[in-house]
């Protein structure tokens, strides 16, 4: 497993899977990669990958709608790096199919309230539960209520369906299973593109009915199978809006400036810190999906001149990032590591856990 962060975080399913490529695949630690995948798939319950384990008795905790869906992307990346289809077929494929089956029929384990609606979109959570990564809660007060049809969850759902269909074809599974997966994926993509585009803000809704500008929409472009076609103007508009409103040298802000409850500085007592956690504070790990979305737009561009222009802008983004984090790694609060989050105004002070796995990985 992977520890989410020091000094206080333990091993979390969501954090482990987001950190998976950067910590084990990039370093060619494929034996560790297999062990991590086996760890977080051995306790799947009703289609849910554990989001963690109790620090008291080590029982699995299932307070997450995204951990199971993140698994598919990491399995795909594991294959991309290793071509190890045998391991996936023998140890993971049946479990992946069962996750799809459970999400389709509905899951109410630990009040996750996950179900596939008639419009082929996944709905999850309630006013009382927090099961996405924006999970701050103060007592009974949910700071960022995101119950309903979340943008990143449905992007991950489409991606999961397409990856499973790809594996089903590779493993010569039943033709009916392959066709069902592809049909469901096509219907999900159609519905997503019809409902999630926010024409007014030139981006995607964070949750259907919620027009706050947040970075979660990047997952619609960053995954192996983007639910938004990277060639389209919608994709470019969305990416430009995120770049303009949320990107800075240290990561992406969790909420655009000007939105209600926007907060730039992470400070004060535990209540004030929790209130601001996902309300404008900068998170470095979001640079990962931002970069992947950027690359997918570049790969999809047909115009040679425009592609060259995009490549030039991407190189400038990478160089600026290298400069920022070379200094941070050598002169920051934690030499050799990257913090959990940063303030969103100068001097962009590092805050939260002083060594965060997904910050380093992404």
Residue ranges, per PLM feature:
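Extended glycan-interaction surfaces of carbohydrate-active proteins
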Residues: 1-11, 35-56, 108-149, 187-285, ...
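Aromatic-rich carbohydrate-recognition surfaces in CAZymes
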Residues: 10-16, 20-131, 150-154, 158, ...
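Alpha-helical structural elements of signaling/regulatory helical domains
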Residues: 28-29, 84, 88, 173, ...
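Short alpha-helical functional segments enriched in proximate histidine and acidic residues
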Residues: 102-103, 160, 164-167, 188-195, ...
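Surface-exposed helix-capping loop/turn segments at secondary-structure junctions
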Residues: 109, 166-176, 196-201, 300-302
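Active-site neighborhood of glycoside hydrolase catalytic domains
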Residues: 154-190
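Extended, well-ordered alpha-helical segments in internal regulatory regions
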Residues: 161-169, 220, 224-229, 289-302
């Amino acid at each position: 497993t992977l520890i989410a962060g020091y000094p206080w975080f333990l091993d979390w399913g969501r954090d482990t899977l987001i950190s998976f490529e950067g910590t084990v695949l990039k370093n060619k630690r494929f034996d560790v990669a297999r062990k991590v995948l086996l760890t977080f798939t051995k306790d799947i319950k009703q289609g849910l990958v554990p989001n963690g384990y109790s620090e008291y008795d080590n029982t699995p905790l299932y307070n997450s709608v995204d951990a199971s869906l993140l698994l598919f992307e990491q399995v795909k990346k594991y294959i991309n790096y290793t071509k190890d289809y045998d391991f996936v077929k023998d140890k993971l494929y049946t479990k992946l199919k069962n996750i799809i089956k459970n999400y389709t029929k509905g899951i109410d384990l630990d009040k996750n309230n996950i179900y596939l609606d008639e419009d082929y979109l996944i709905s999850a959570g309630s006013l009382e539960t927090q099961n996405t990564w924006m999970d701050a809660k103060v007592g009974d007060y949910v700071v960022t209520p995101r119950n309903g049809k979340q943008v990143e969850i449905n992007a991950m759902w489409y991606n999961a369906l397409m990856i499973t269909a790809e594996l089903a074809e590779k493993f010569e599974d039943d033709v009916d299973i392959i066709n069902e997966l592809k049909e469901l994926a096509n219907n999900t993509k159609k519905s997503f593109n019809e409902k999630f585009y926010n024409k007014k803000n030139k981006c995607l809704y964070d949750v259907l009915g919620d027009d706050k500008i947040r970075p979660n929409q990047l997952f619609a472009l960053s995954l192996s199978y983007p639910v938004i076609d990277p060639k389209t103007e919608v994709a470019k508009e969305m990416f430009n809006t995120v770049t303009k409103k949320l990107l800075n040298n240290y990561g992406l802000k969790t909420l655009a400036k000007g939105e209600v409850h926007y907060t730039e500085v992470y400070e004060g007592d535990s209540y004030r810190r929790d209130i601001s956690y996902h309300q404008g504070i900068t998170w470095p790990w979001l640079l990962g999906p931002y970069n992947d979305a950027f690359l997918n737009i570049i790969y999809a561009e047909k115009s040679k001149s425009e592609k060259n222009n995009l490549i030039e802008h991407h190189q400038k983004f990478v160089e600026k990032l290298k400069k920022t984090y070379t200094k941070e790694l050598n002169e920051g609060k934690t030499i050799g590591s990257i913090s959990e989050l940063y303030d969103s105004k100068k001097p962009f002070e590092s805050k939260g856990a002083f060594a965060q796995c997904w910050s380093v990985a992404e």
